């Protein structure tokens, strides 16, 4: 436990990016060594900026001790990236989380046929039923289902997995002591009992809109494959799909009606060849049967007729959740820079304030080299500050504050 407080301290240094934390760990070896280093030693780390060195001068462990106390009371486990049971699949992604909080029993992910299921929070009855049925089939056939416990397709995926008596893992964008959405209290309990809830955010961290695109890299990173159940053209589920592709993982999508707005994202993934078309769980699992013959239990399974009966009720809840999300559009204060943005990122955000722009326009307006613009956009898309739309136009997903 003594060593864990340094992991918590490093993970909670305000304004320090995940990339910077990884650079420090790579240089110093352990967070304890990072803690006891001085400013001269920090300057030796390539990629660490003077502003970040000043942040590391704050050596109080009071917040870390408070978080560890909360974890003890809540029965949470802390998993660091240097622990032997930290999943290798996750360790190998771009910018893995340094620290994870875990409630429940996390299976040995590297030995499992873990499949992520994502989709819109405003899922239609069609999407809800598809999510439940596919998740049910996956778990009955020996897979582990990973999702985000959000309203809509996520919740339906977890329900299907639980109905099958299988293991399911929820990756949250908030602390494990906070239920979001509130009506998923029972779902949280059932997931923790049969699998695990995990988060890179400590107890007490509220659900913020920009947390969710960041946590998506964990959902796909833990998984062999990602299934997009239902997604419109600008769905966060498509960010997860793109992240999965960048991680070298397989992507599948459930096709929908050609005139259904909620299926346009899935249909586009399939049409572009970015995702394989599936209609049931076996369409996914047969890809891994030869590699995991001891895990995959058979071909198709018989589905209970009652699967999907909650679809319309879930749709109503999803609409309410979506409305609440719009009302709580996150803000980003550029003056205080609590998010730890680089100068390049701040310049790009300010340039996008007047409207969406393509990369070439951003390079011209900011006079920042191409490589740095692309790097900054990638990081900000992962953090949920910008999104890429049609025609490769980038736009803001936050409200900028300058006060």
Task: Enumerate the language-model features and the residues they cover.
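Glycine-biased, small-residue-rich flexible motifs in mid-sequence functional cores and linkers
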Residues: 1-4, 80-403
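Short, small/acidic-rich helices and loops at N termini and domain boundaries
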Residues: 1-84, 269, 385, 391-392, ...
């Amino acid at each position: 436990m003594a060593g864990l407080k340094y992991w918590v301290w490093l993970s909670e240094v305000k304004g320090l990016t995940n990339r910077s934390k990884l650079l420090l760990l790579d240089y110093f070896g352990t967070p304890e060594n990072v803690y006891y280093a001085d400013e001269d030693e920090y300057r030796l780390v390539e990629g660490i900026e003077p502003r970040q060195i000043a942040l590391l001068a704050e050596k109080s462990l009071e917040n870390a001790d408070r978080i560890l106390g909360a974890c003890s009371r809540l029965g949470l486990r802390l998993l660091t990236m240097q622990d032997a049971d930290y999943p290798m699949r996750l360790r190998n992604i771009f910018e893995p989380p340094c620290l994870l909080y875990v409630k429940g029993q996390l299976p040995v992910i590297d030995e499992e046929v873990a499949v992520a299921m994502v989709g819109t929070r405003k899922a239609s009855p069609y999407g809800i039923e598809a999510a439940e049925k596919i998740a049910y089939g996956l778990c009955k056939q020996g897979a582990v289902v990973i999702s985000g416990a959000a309203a809509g397709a996520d919740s339906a995926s977890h329900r299907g997995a639980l109905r099958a008596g299988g293991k399911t893992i929820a990756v949250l964008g908030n602390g494990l002591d906070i239920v979001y959405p509130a009506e998923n209290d029972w779902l949280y309990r059932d997931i923790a009992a049969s699998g695990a809830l995990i988060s890179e955010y400590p107890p007490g961290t509220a659900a913020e809109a920009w947390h969710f695109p960041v946590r998506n890299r964990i959902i796909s990173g833990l998984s062999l494959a990602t299934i997009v159940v239902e997604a419109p053209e600008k769905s966060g589920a498509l960010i997860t799909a793109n992240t999965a592709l960048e991680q070298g993982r397989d992507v599948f999508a459930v096709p929908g009606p050609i005139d259904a707005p909620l299926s346009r994202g899935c249909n586009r993934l399939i049409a572009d060849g970015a995702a394989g078309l599936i209609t049931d769980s076996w369409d996914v699992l047969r890809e891994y049967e030869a590699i995991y013959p001891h895990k995959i239990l058979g071909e198709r399974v018989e589905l209970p007729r009652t699967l999907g009966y909650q679809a319309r009720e879930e749709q109503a809840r999803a609409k309410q959740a979506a409305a609440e999300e719009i009302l709580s559009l996150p803000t980003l204060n550029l003056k205080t820079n609590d998010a730890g943005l680089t100068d390049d990122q701040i310049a790009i955000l300010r340039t996008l304030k007047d409207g969406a722009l393509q990369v070439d326009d951003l390079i011209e307006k900011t006079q920042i080299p191409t490589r740095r613009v692309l790097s900054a956009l990638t990081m900000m898309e992962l953090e949920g500050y910008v999104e890429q739309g049609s025609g490769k136009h980038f736009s803001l997903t936050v409200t900028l504050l300058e006060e």
